[in-house]
Structures are given as structure tokens and as C-alpha cells.
Amino acid sequence: MKFPTDLIEGRLVKRYKRFFADVELADGEVVTAHCANTGAMTGIKTPGLPVWLSRSDNPKRKLKYTWELVEAEGTLIGALPNLANSLAEEAVNAGVISELTGYDSLRREVKYGENSRIDLLLEGNDRPPCWVEVKNVHWQRGPGIAEFPDGVTSRGAKHLVELANQVQAGERAVQLFIVQRSDCDVLRPAEDIDPVYARTLRDSAAAGVEVLAYACEVSPTAVIIHRPMRVELSQ
């Protein structure tokens, strides 16, 4: 997925109140950018890190800038979790995610479960519907190892239970992790951060939910899903 405009490089001054980040630009000006990542952002919110911003000239916006990328541990990382759904849709349509090919239609945000909306619903070609829940991952905890989540997510565990229910109903369900960095080969649940989520992920996989992970190539011009990763669920 290409960025529609050129990104602006700066240095992170601080991230605060979840939605805001102060960034020093190359000319010394400090601007406030919208931070669309409301999570813990573990490892990618350290003051001084290089960051990239997009700029909007929409007069209705309170903040002109949006925090898009960050460089940590020598690697560019996508900072927008909500981009993961669009990346997944683009990759499915392009046939990049081989496990999710062969369907006639793709819909987003379809209601299911208990007041939930599935990220992607694949249908058609005389196949059972395929319910795909997408989770964004940015956190590297060891060389080549990405982990999720970086904070407790009861909502994420709820989604896994709902995916398992779809399998029980005779349909297909997939938990898809989009890792917005290129330096990881393995995806693991962060057992110490959220043991309930880790256990629920293993239980749902045992019940037939497919667990996939894909890494991205990240640059100041685009973020693109490009290769599968190994998933390790054992403790």
C-alpha cells in the first residue's frame, strides 16, 4: 500500500495522552501529530526515535500531521494498527496470502458473533465462508521474534472465541497477524503480558481456527505484505 503523499521525517519528542505525539522536524520546528495507535506501543515510543509523518491540508482536521512510521532497532515499523486491515485486503486481492486465495468476494466489517464485526469475510466459489480476524503486530522481543499483544486485550480473546464458534458451525475461521516490520521470522503470543489471550489462542487453534502471520516490507513510500512467518503457539 503506497502512501498518497511524501512522508516527512522527524524525531519523536514524546507521545502522550494516547492520541498525541510531539515531533521535531528537520528545520527544528516541533509539531503535534495524531497518534492513531492507542496501544502501549512498547519499544516504538522512545523519545529521539526517527519517525515519519503524513500531512493533510483538510481544514476540518485539528491536527495536520499523522504519525505513520517509526525506526527502531535499525528497522522501519508501521505505526498505524488500523492500516493492517487495508494491507490484508490488498494482499488477499493480489493473491499474496496463498492460504486465502480462491474466493469470489471479500467484504469488510460484517456483523457476527456477539456485537462484533469481522475484519474480512471471504465468500463464494462453492466454498464455506471464511471469517478473517486481523491483528496488527509491531513488537520484536528477541532477534527475529515478534510477539502479540503488548498489552492485555480481552477484546482480542473474545474475537478468538467467536472465530472458534464459526468453525464449530462448519465454516472457516482465520486469525491473521500482520507484522508491520521486515526483521522477524517467528510470531508468538506474549504469554507473560496476557496469559489469557495466549491460552485462548492455543485453544482456538486446537478447535480449528487457522493462525497465520505475514511480515511486511516497510519504507517511506509504502507498506506491503510480502512473506509468511512461522507461528509458534507452544509455551
UniProtKB/Swiss-Prot annotation:
It comes from the Bacteria. Pfam families: SfsA, SfsA_N. One of its GO terms (molecular function) is DNA binding. HAMAP family: SfsA. Belongs to the SfsA family. This is Sugar fermentation stimulation protein homolog.
